[in-house]
């Protein structure tokens, strides 16, 4: 079972959002476009430091590639530089694009979304890896990438995401609880951010509670290129998920 940390929550566009949830959406859209706010940068730095301290060993930071090399560089280059400045071990070439792939919401879902990823075994072996990406929904790409890293000798792989998708339809609202319907439980374990305590996701549902209002550029008409599987559902309109 793979573990992951996330910083905030992403509510899909089809749901009416509070001002705080709308701010979180815009923060995610900005990050997709390569905009790294001070708030997001500092949150990633804090979580990488917490994971490394919890592991008791020096970790290596890697990134899950986007659909193209260009998008991977755009999305993660500023964060990579910020983490290096803080003294973390960041390796952009441990997991990398071997070729560009068409976005899965255009071309259909692949049985193996990592088919266009390359892995540098010499950089992976005997390392604890913090694997960063933007949004976690079902976790298929993360789990398959983590499995490949472990196959190549990684000691452990811990995911770190800017946001986790929340979907009110999948909660047992009739019970008045925050228990996630077992049908939609991903094969992961959440590391909660407050104290790094390991809890199963269905035992506690974290509520988004931002410390400050997030102001982004005017993105009211922006339809972000959420090209990866974890941002889409199966509907024909390709609504953000």
Tell what function each PLM region has:
Residues 63-67, 162-163:
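Short loop/turn motifs enriched for small/polar and acidic residues
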Residues 74-90:
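Glycine-rich phosphate-binding loop and adjoining helix at the ATP-binding site
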Residues 58, 87-90, 154-156:
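A generic structural signal for alpha->beta connector loops
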Residues 65-75:
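Glycine-rich phosphate-binding loops at beta-strand->alpha-helix junctions
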Residues 1-60, 95-125, 165:
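Active-site-facing substrate-recognition patch
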Residues 93, 97-204, 238:
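PRPP/pyrophosphate-binding module of the type I phosphoribosyltransferase fold
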């Amino acid at each position: 079972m793979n573990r992951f940390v996330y910083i905030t929550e992403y509510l899909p566009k089809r749901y009416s959002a509070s001002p705080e949830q709308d701010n979180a959406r815009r923060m995610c859209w900005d990050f997709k476009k390569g905009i790294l706010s001070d708030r997001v940068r500092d949150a990633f730095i804090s979580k990488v430091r917490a994971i490394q301290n919890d592991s008791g060993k020096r970790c290596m930071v890697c990134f899950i590639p986007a659909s193209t090399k260009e998008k991977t560089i755009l999305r993660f280059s500023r964060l990579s530089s910020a983490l290096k400045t803080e003294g973390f071990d960041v390796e952009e070439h441990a997991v990398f694009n071997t070729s560009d792939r068409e976005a899965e919401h255009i071309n259909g879902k692949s049985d193996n979304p990592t088919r266009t990823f390359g892995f540098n075994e010499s950089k992976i072996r005997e390392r604890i890896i913090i694997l960063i990406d933007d949004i976690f929904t079902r976790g298929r790409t993360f789990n398959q990438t983590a499995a490949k890293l472990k196959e190549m000798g990684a000691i452990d792989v811990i995911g770190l995401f800017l946001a986790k998708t929340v979907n009110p339809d999948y909660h047992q609202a009739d019970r008045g609880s925050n228990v996630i319907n077992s049908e939609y439980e991903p094969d992961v374990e959440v590391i909660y951010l407050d104290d790094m305590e390991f809890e199963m996701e269905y035992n506690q549902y974290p509520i988004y509670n931002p410390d400050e209002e997030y102001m982004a550029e005017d993105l009211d008409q922006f339809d972000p290129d959420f090209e990866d599987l974890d941002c889409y559902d199966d509907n024909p309109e390709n609504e953000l998920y």
